[in-house]
């Protein structure tokens, strides 16, 4: 036991910044305080007049609680907005919601019944509005709990009256620019929805279907010389997986340049693509009894075949470029009312666009066969009828990828109905969009190829829906001609004004007479609603153009990778149709969340992780850190192991912050700062290192490489600070005089670093950043209004950056030798070691600059530097280490042995100068002067 207690002479660090974050419990209180103090408003005030940066929120659908994918999306947006704010931009964030459409209708129907049965259409729309509002409030609470800042009190809602009105105005502008067309055209149709579907509402799943080969007897083969001499009937064979579409067949398509052969079989003479004869006959289990003729497809154009189910119908053989010989027979069953390729080729030949199927899948009374029967029940009846009349060549089952409704997960059909379209070709919309896609920055870069391929192949956009809850297509069509009213634009503006005052109900509840007066008898008022993708796709006009704090085009659209076929595409098309330019400067996409085995999360697998449960366990900051540290460009893995990695990363950052804050607890930068040029060399070096890291972090934020941001931060905390700088300065912080130059120099450096570090983590660890900020600046100050830290200007002088790189290299080698010596029981701690370093050249020069302070860098009681030539013969062999600042190899020998002397009871260094000050017989000379003298001075470490 020391005779005197020196504890009170040490600078023991303390801070209110707790070791345990307790985020899950404390974050709600912070949120409540921030909301009460209008932090978002303070940020707007702080950036008033600055250059704008607009991230436009893609609206989530107002239905159900948020899932982990929602959390990823909103947090990524928040990181960008907060980082741009730190970069000096005025970056307002206006969240939005998509409020119309079928899922909400279904929820209301389940509770209140269908329109016309238990509720009127007007009542139904009111119930839909109310349901959407309740869902928005639930989701809003979850988004705010994530620490996402935004104008939550004034979000945009596609069901706001003024926004519904502006959606109508957007349609009017697109109509005025000549992009809206009407026609009987096959569209994606869900029998469960009883409505058309947008491309984005269709997903592909495997399905088992009936596959049949059917023969059509050619009735006028004699018109082709090569076929005229063939004895017996010739039958063209088609293949289809949708037998129910055969009643709508209007033609058989062939390719003009493919060869077709008439093959004799025990089932008669069959016409097949020459390249498919063998595979087809093998499938039919028929023998090739000889090829009777071979002709080019174009020679068969204009022949007719008897429909196998409808006696009164003969169908032509036509030519189409869509016909291939990859499989089947090379002859394609063509029903323009049930397929887009069929429809397109049908236009060329003026084929009827017959649709004998109702919206619920029942054959209409006008159908030539099977009237009143549901198409799926008719399938086996059609197959049986073909078998009975001898036209069924083969019937099998196949599993194939088939389009399904994304809501009902049920197979869709293609069905021609009168619909409104935005044409891709009439005014060159496709061409214009493709020309502008390369002008946008796509992140990741492959997003450009993806949307280009989708834009190249997409059909006209069917914008009409047969729903109750949606924005109306405010058209009036003439009862006889089908033409739109000549004053359509004026009528649409009138409708928009009324909707602005009373919502979409102002259209639906009004009569034709309310708009047209005496003309009403000649016109039909449209009852269709707009595709909800039109609602969200026109927010560049209905939101960005209408709010003073926003700008159009936006700087950034950010959504999941599925939105190349959804919101990105519909926004691009509507903007091109309205303004002839994209609505965004940059588009960023993120991957989906999967479990740790790479599986999609689903109830059936029992692997769903909700953001709510994770936040309740560890807090929103931990979830935000997982999101930021994941490479969002790919699938994002979530689970216990992955989350543990984020927890460990968080602890490293928090512990570093705690050390920095504790060691500046008594530091007043106004009175205690050391002039930047008078700092200890090590302190200058770590500030310069922090400047370098800050530049890397800001660059990574600007590039949206948030996982790189987290790596830079954690590497700086663990390597530059934890393993090097903070370890070295502990002695200086604790043992030198409280107000002495060595300690205040370190505190000055720490102050600059913690100011920067808090800002670095603010976009990601928002709660923790503000908690740390308040320790420095009080509860009335917010880091969210700050900009990136500006470090003081200075130059390294006595010891250069290259010197420090070599010194760190030597320190690493010393640490390895000390660990070996500890393992061999030569020493039991760093301070029980003396080290000799034998070096030459640049390494010797760099180490020599530290002089007597070398031991403080190495954290040993003594350190002696000697020329390499003096290394004892018994010493360890030379260690070779590559000098990172040169191309050569550095020779350095490290020798570790037990320190000789007496242990100082205050600093624990083992020295031979213990008791040289008689007033303090148990202290080393350094501690004695720090306790009762002038205090030590440090120059280098």
UniProtKB/Swiss-Prot annotation:
Monomer. Its cofactor is Zn(2+). ATP binds at residue 603. GO terms for biological process: isoleucyl-tRNA aminoacylation. It is an enzyme of class 6 (ligase). GO terms for molecular function: aminoacyl-tRNA deacylase activity; ATP binding; isoleucine-tRNA ligase activity; tRNA binding; zinc ion binding. This is Isoleucine--tRNA ligase. It holds the Pfam family zf-FPG_IleRS. The gene is ileS. It catalyses: tRNA(Ile) + L-isoleucine + ATP = L-isoleucyl-tRNA(Ile) + AMP + diphosphate. L-isoleucyl-5'-AMP binds at residue 559. PANTHER family: ISOLEUCINE--TRNA LIGASE, MITOCHONDRIAL, SOLEUCYL-TRNA SYNTHETASE. Binds 1 zinc ion per subunit. InterPro entries: aa-tRNA-synth_I_CS, aa-tRNA-synth_Ia, Anticodon_Ile_BEm, Ile-tRNA-ligase, Ile-tRNA-ligase_type1, Ile-tRNA_ligase, M/V/L/I-tRNA-synth_anticd-bd, Rossmann-like_a/b/a_fold. NCBIfam families: ileS. Its EC number is 6.1.1.5. Belongs to the class-I aminoacyl-tRNA synthetase family. IleS type 1 subfamily. GO terms for cellular component: cytosol. A motif ('KMSKS' region) lies at residues 600-604.
